[in-house]
């Protein structure tokens, strides 16, 4: 009998409906999501498990997903980061890539593609 290791993913998005939808999608895919309504809420949660991947909305109220990624990098944390956005444009995409994203999706992209990217990123070491 093989033992399955859970993949823990932080989902940071201020759209409550999207967080619920992503949570259902990830759980159905065997991934354990923990959702946060803001970057600040994520940073304030000191009792979270080690995450295998972060799924960050780019345009959040308060600190943006890109600012959160930069802050984590400055603090020596280098988790795999997947950015999602409803407002795609070349400048935002370039900024996300400069912040070190593993993958980048529009919120309208396929859930299967997002799951595949998380599974690939989840194979990396837990870093936060």
Name each model feature, range by range.
Residues 44, 66-77:
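Short amphipathic alpha-helix used as the core "switch/output" element in two-component signaling
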Residues 1-10, 16-23, 38, 112-128:
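Non-catalytic signal-transmission and effector/linker regions of two-component phosphorelay proteins
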Residues 37-38, 64-67:
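Acidic catalytic/metal-coordinating carboxylates
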